[in-house]
Regions:
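Juxtamembrane helix-entry segments on the extracytoplasmic side of multipass membrane proteins
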Residues: 153-157
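Cytosolic, intrinsically disordered low-complexity tails and loops
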Residues: 310-324
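Heptad-repeat alpha-helical coiled-coil signal-transmission segments
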Residues: 285-288, 292-299, 303-306, 310-313
């Protein structure tokens, strides 16, 4: 028994170190993906969607605060990959680590469920996990640029807004996908597969077309989003929102389609408004549909139990000697 205890004691630190490295690697990989598409406003570079914030919040919700060192390590690796280390950089590191931690604490405070089965869970993720908590990282990052004279004071708010929305978008799109990845089940019905393939084909054709067309047709994506939410709930709607946001970001960084002939600030505002409303609609619509489905299942189960009770009352319970 003592040998087993010692083995477990040796195993736990190793497992924790592996978890920390995995979280750091996931954060760093998501950061490198996010840096593939950048926008420049008044000389400051930021990403319209910053996936590492979504990875960080999801890891905290799944594993708890013990993964915070992994998040900090991943953030440090991302910073080291784009700039040299100096004392002021650690302010950004603190902001990038503290924002997901605050998101986790606020979500736990209100009883957030990782299955996103209630409308209140979707609202909590939007307003607490994304919009409120990411104020920290945006303020630390943009504020540091101003204090170090790398950004003019009059440019603070545009850069701060872009930073804030980019971090929030990472939470709104990436976090739900990672949380649902543990519970999603592929449809076994052939008809469901056919519908899923048809929806994917429609999205694959229409979304690139409208995001790269100079005529403003972005609204055509919303029927596809509603279809995905109604039939496939979170798995369908969030994947649709992610693909649409990525394609819109590509068009915006290339200044093509509906983002052509616009200033950098106008491109940022239009892109962030589209991405934000897309993610918000997908998340809340799927939450409402899932909650209604769970309510219907609960009512059906209650009716079934009531029918069984009535059957015992009218026919008699054989275990108590009753006769029909």
């Amino acid at each position: 028994m003592a040998a087993v205890v010692r083995f477990e004691e040796l195993r736990r630190p190793g497992g924790y170190a592996l978890l920390t490295l995995a979280v750091a690697g996931g954060y760093f990989g998501a950061g490198r993906l996010g840096l593939l598409r950048e926008l420049v406003v008044d000389g400051a570079v930021f990403t319209p969607i910053w996936p590492p914030t979504g990875v960080a919040v999801a890891c905290l919700l799944i594993f708890g605060l013990r993964v915070l060192p992994g998040i900090a390590l991943g953030a440090l690796l991302v910073i080291m990959s784009i700039t040299s280390l100096h004392p002021t950089v650690f302010v950004i590191l603190v902001g990038n680590t503290l924002a997901p931690a605050c998101a986790y604490l606020m979500l736990r405070r209100v009883g957030f469920r990782t299955d996103l089965g209630r409308l209140r869970d979707g609202l909590a993720l939007v307003f607490l996990g994304a919009l409120s908590a990411m104020l920290i990282s945006a303020t630390c990052g943009a504020g540091l640029l101003v204090l170090t004279d790398r950004l003019a004071a009059h440019s603070f708010w545009p850069v701060w807004l872009g930073w804030w929305v980019g971090d929030a978008m990472g939470v709104l799109i990436v976090t739900p996908l990672l949380l649902l990845l543990r519970t999603v089940r592929l449809p076994l019905d052939l008809r469901r597969w056919k519908e899923a393939l048809g929806l994917a084909a429609a999205i694959g054709v229409i979304v690139p077309l409208v995001t790269h067309n100079r005529v403003s047709l972005l609204f055509l994506i919303y029927p596809l989003l509603i279809w995905a939410a109604l039939r496939f709930r979170f798995a369908g709607s969030m994947l649709c929102a992610l693909f649409a946001s990525v394609m819109a970001t590509v068009a915006a960084t290339q200044e093509t389609g509906p983002f052509a002939d616009l200033t950098h600030v106008e491109v940022m505002m239009k892109l962030q408004a589209f991405n934000g409303t897309m993610a918000f609609t997908a998340l809340l619509l799927s939450a409402v549909i899932t909650e209604q489905r769970n309510t219907r299942i609960s009512v059906e189960n209650a009716c079934q139990e009531l029918a069984e009770v009535l059957e015992h009352l009218t026919a008699g319970d054989p275990r108590q000697g009753g006769r029909p």
